[in-house]
Amino acid sequence: ILRDLMTEGRKEFIDQAEKENRKQVYYLCMEFLMGRSLRNNLYNLGLEDAVSSALSSMGLKLENIYNQEPDAGLGNGGLGRLAACFLDGLATQKYPAMGYSLRYEYGIFRQKLVDGWQTELPDFWLPGGAVWLQAHPEKAVTVNFNGHLEERWDGSFHSIEVKDATKILA
C-alpha cells in the first residue's frame, strides 16, 4: 500500500513537472546507501502515527516491523551515502529527480570473525528489500559481454557490429 501511495504521488508530481516544462535530474551512480526505507517513507508521507496506532490496536509495535527491514547496503561508504543525501535533498526541495544504478543481487559484504580471521560474507538484501523495487521488463535491453567488434565503412557511413558476444537481457 505504501509503495502504491508513493508511486501515485510520484506520478502526479512528474506529470505536473512535465506540464510546467520543468527540467528533471537523472542521477546515475554505482552506489546508493539509502538505509532502511520504511521509517523514512512513512515519516515523509505523514503516516507514521496512523500506522503505529493501527498496528498498536492489533497488538503490534511499529518499531518491531522497522527492525525486520534489511538495510539496502548498495555501496560501502562515502559515495553511496553522498548519493543518498543528494537524492534526499532534491526530493526535500521538490526537484523532479530520479536516481539510477544497477540492481545488485548482493549489497556490501558482511564481515565475520572465524577462528580469529576476518571472513567476508555476501549481504542478501533482496529477500526483504525487494518490496521497494519496481520491475519494468518492457524497458529491458540487450547487453553484450565479451565478443569482439567489427568496424565497417560503407562510403561515408560507419558502423560497428558486436560479434560472438554473450547477450543478456537487462
PLM feature spans:
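A conserved ligand/cofactor-binding region detector
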Residues: 1-170
